[in-house]
C-alpha cells in the first residue's frame, strides 16, 4: 500500500511505502526537539523504533525528519526525540513508524566516507552502498563470546607501549587541550593499526566543533589515511554529530560509530580502533534529552540514567573471540573537576589514560605524552612480564627524580648537584628525548620518515640507556629517532659533522 503523507499537498511526490508492519500516526505536540505522536489503538511502536515525518513546511520546503521513540505515554501516545532540526513541523503531520530501530550502512563501503547519525553520507561524494545495514541498538556480546585473555595492543609508539600500554579490546582515555598533538596522535594510531594489525578505524565525532571535524578530514586526506583516489583503500570511517545538531543526534552518533566498528569486528573479524571525541558530549546530550523527556535530574543536574547510558555504550566496546574493538576516548573534564559525575562515571570504564602535556609540546617533544601522568592497568609484571615492568618503573623513577631536581637546577645550576644526581639528569634528558619519535602522518610536515617501533626494540633501547652504555653520547642523538640503533647512528653522524665544522 502507498500513501501520500501530506493530503494538503496531494500533488507532491513524497510517498512512503507502508507495509503490513508500518503504522501511521500524527504529531500531537512539539516541544523543541521532542515530539509527541498519537497512534491508533493497538498500533503503538516499540521503544527505540525509528519514526519518519515527511511533508512540506509553510514555505513549501521539503521536510524529512527521523525521530526515535523514547517513551510510551499512555492514551496511545509516544514521545520521540528528533535526530535533526524540527523547524517547519506542525501538529497533525503524518508520522510513519518504520517498525525497527535506526539502521546504518556497515562494512567496506563506509571507509573513507563521512556520515551523520542516520548513516547518510555528508561528504558530497555520492551515495553509499547500503545493502548491508545494521541497527544501532543491540546487546553487548554474551559472556561466552568474550575473549578474556589479557593481551597488549602494540601501537608502535614507544612512550605508549612502554609506560601506559593499551589493552587489546580495552578503553583508553585521552586527555589533552588544544594544540598539544591529540589529532596527530589519533591519526598515527589509525595509520599504525592498519599497517601492523591489518585493522581499520572508526572515528565518532560526538558534539565536537564542525571546524575541528573538517580539519581532521582534511589532515587525513593529506596524510593518506583517507585515499581519495581509491576510497576502498582508506583506513577509517568518520561519523559526525556536531555541536550545532539537536541533542538526539549527539546522543546517538556514538552508537552509529560503534555499530560500524562492531561489523568490522564480528563479520570481518578484524581488530578495530574506535575513537570517540568527546565522550563528555555524549553524557551532555543525554542530560539535555533527559530534561526534555521530563525526568527528574540527578546529581549536578545530570540524568538519573547516567550510569546505565554509559554502561550500555561501553559494554559493547570489547574483545570477542573473533576480533577486538579498542576504544580511545577523548575526555573533557568540566572545570578540571575529576569528581564531576560525567568524568567520574567514564573513569570506571577506562583501562588506561594517555595524558598529553603542553610542557612537552613546548619543548618540541612529540608525541607530547606525559610519561608520569599516563597510567595503565596493564602495566603489571604478570601481564607484561618482569623485563618490561622493571624497565618502565626505572624509566619513571629516573624521570621523577629529574622532575624533583629541576627547581634546584633552576636556582643553583647543574654544577651544584652530586655526581649521582648529575648522571640521573643526563640519563633522564636522554630518556625524555628517546620517548619522542617521528610519525608517519607527520612526514609531510617534518620531512623525516615515520618509524614503527616494536615493543621488544623499545624495551631494549631504554634498558641500554638506563644501564649507562650510552652515557657518552650527546642527548640530541636520541631526539626524534625510532629504535636505539638509529640513535647510535645519529650520534656518529653528529660527531662527523662537528669534526667537519672544525
Swiss-Prot record:
EC category: translocase
Positions of ATP binding: 176-183
Keywords: ATP synthesis, ATP-binding, CF(1), Chloroplast, Hydrogen ion transport, Ion transport, Membrane, Nucleotide-binding, Phosphoprotein, Plastid, Thylakoid, Translocase, Transport
Topology in the lipid bilayer: Peripheral membrane protein
Signal peptide residue numbers: none
InterPro entries associated with the record: AAA+_ATPase, ATP-synt_VA_C, ATP_synth_F1_bsu, ATPase_a/bsu_AS, ATPase_alpha/beta_chains, ATPase_F1/V1/A1_a/bsu_N, ATPase_F1/V1/A1_a/bsu_N_sf, ATPase_F1/V1/A1_a/bsu_nucl-bd
Enzyme Commission number, as recorded: 7.1.2.2
Record field: catalytic activity: ATP + H2O + 4 H(+)(in) = ADP + phosphate + 5 H(+)(out)
One MF annotation (Gene Ontology) recorded for this entry: ATP hydrolysis activity
GO biological process, one term: proton motive force-driven mitochondrial ATP synthesis
Protein name listed in UniProt: ATP synthase subunit beta, chloroplastic
Taxonomic source organism: Lepidium virginicum (Virginia pepperweed)
Lineage per the UniProt record: Eukaryota, Viridiplantae, Streptophyta, Embryophyta, Tracheophyta
Amino acid at each position: 500500500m502507498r500513501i501520500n503523507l501530506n493530503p494538503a499537498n496531494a500533488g507532491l511526490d513524497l510517498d512512503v511505502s507502508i507495509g503490513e508492519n508500518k503504522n501511521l500516526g500524527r504529531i500531537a505536540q512539539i516541544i523543541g526537539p521532542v515530539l509527541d505522536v498519537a497512534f491508533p489503538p493497538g498500533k503503538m511502536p516499540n521503544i527505540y523504533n525509528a519514526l519518519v515525518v515527511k511533508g512540506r513546511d509553510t514555505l513549501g520546503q521539503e521536510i524529512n525528519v527521523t525521530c526515535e521513540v523514547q517513551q510510551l505515554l499512555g492514551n496511545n501516545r509516544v514521545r520521540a526525540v528528533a535526530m535533526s532540526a524540527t523547524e517547519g513541523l506542525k501538529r497533525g503531520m503524518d508520522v510513519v513508524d518504520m517498525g525497527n530501530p535506526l539502521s546504518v550502512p556497515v562494512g567496506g563501503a563506509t571507509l573513507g566516507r563521512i556520515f551523520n547519525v542516520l548513516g547518510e553520507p555528508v561528504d558530497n561524494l555520492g551515495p553509499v552502498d547500503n545493502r548491508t545495514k545494521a541497527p544501532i541498538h543491540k546487546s553487548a556480546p554474551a559472556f561466552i563470546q568474550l575473549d578474556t585473555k589479557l593481551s597488549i595492543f602494540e601501537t608502535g609508539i614507544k612512550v605508549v607501549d612502554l609506560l601506559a600500554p593499551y589493552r587489546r579490546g580495552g578503553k583508553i582515555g585521552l586527555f589533552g587541550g588544544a594544540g598539544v598533538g591529540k589529532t596527530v596522535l589519533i591519526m598515527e594510531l589509525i595509520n599504525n593499526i592498519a599497517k601492523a594489525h591489518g585493522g581499520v578505524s572508526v572515528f565518532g565525532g560526538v558534539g565536537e566543533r564542525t571546524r575541528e571535524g573538517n580539519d581532521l578530514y582534511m589532515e587525513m586526506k593529506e596524510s593518506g589515511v583517507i585515499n581519495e583516489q581509491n576510497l576502498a583503500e582508506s583506513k577509517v570511517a568518520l561519523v559526525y554529530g556536531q555541536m550545532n545538531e539537536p541533542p538526539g543526534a549527539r546522543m546517538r552518533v556514538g552508537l552509529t560509530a560503534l555499530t560500524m566498528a562492531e561489523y568490522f569486528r564480528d563479520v570481518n573479524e578484524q581488530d578495530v580502533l574506535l575513537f570517540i571525541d568527546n565522550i563528555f558530549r555524549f553524557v551532555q546530550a543525554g542530560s539535555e534529552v533527559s530534561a526534555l523527556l521530563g525526568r527528574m535530574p540527578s546529581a549536578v543536574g545530570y540524568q538519573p540514567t547516567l550510569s546505565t547510558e554509559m554502561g550500555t555504550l561501553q559494554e559493547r566496546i570489547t574483545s570477542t573471540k573473533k576480533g577486538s574493538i579498542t576504544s580511545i576516548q577523548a575526555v573533557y573534564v568540566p572545570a578540571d573537576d575529576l569528581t564531576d559525575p560525567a568524568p567520574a562515571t567514564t573513569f570506571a570504564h577506562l583501562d588506561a589514560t594517555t595524558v598529553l602535556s603542553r610542557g612537552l609540546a613546548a619543548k618540541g617533544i612529540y608525541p607530547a605524552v606525559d610519561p608520569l601522568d599516563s597510567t595503565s592497568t596493564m602495566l603489571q609484571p604478570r601481564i607484561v612480564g618482569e623485563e618490561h615492568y622493571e624497565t618502565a618503573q626505572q624509566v619513571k623513577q629516573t624521570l621523577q627524580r629529574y622532575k624533583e631536581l629541576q627547581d634546584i637546577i633552576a636556582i643553583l645550576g647543574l654544577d651544584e648537584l652530586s655526581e649521582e644526581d648529575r648522571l640521573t639528569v643526563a640519563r633522564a634528558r636522554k630518556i625524555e628525548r628517546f620517548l619522542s619519535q617521528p610519525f608517519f602522518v607527520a612526514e609531510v610536515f617534518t620531512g623525516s620518515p615515520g618509524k614503527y617501533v616494536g615493543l621488544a626494540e623499545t624495551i631494549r633501547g631504554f634498558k641500554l640507556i638506563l644501564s649507562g652504555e650510552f652515557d657518552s653520547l650527546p642527548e640530541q642523538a636520541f631526539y626524534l629517532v625510532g629504535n636505539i640503533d638509529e640513535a647510535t647512528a645519529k650520534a656518529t653522524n653528529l660527531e662527523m659533522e662537528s669534526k667537519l665544522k672544525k
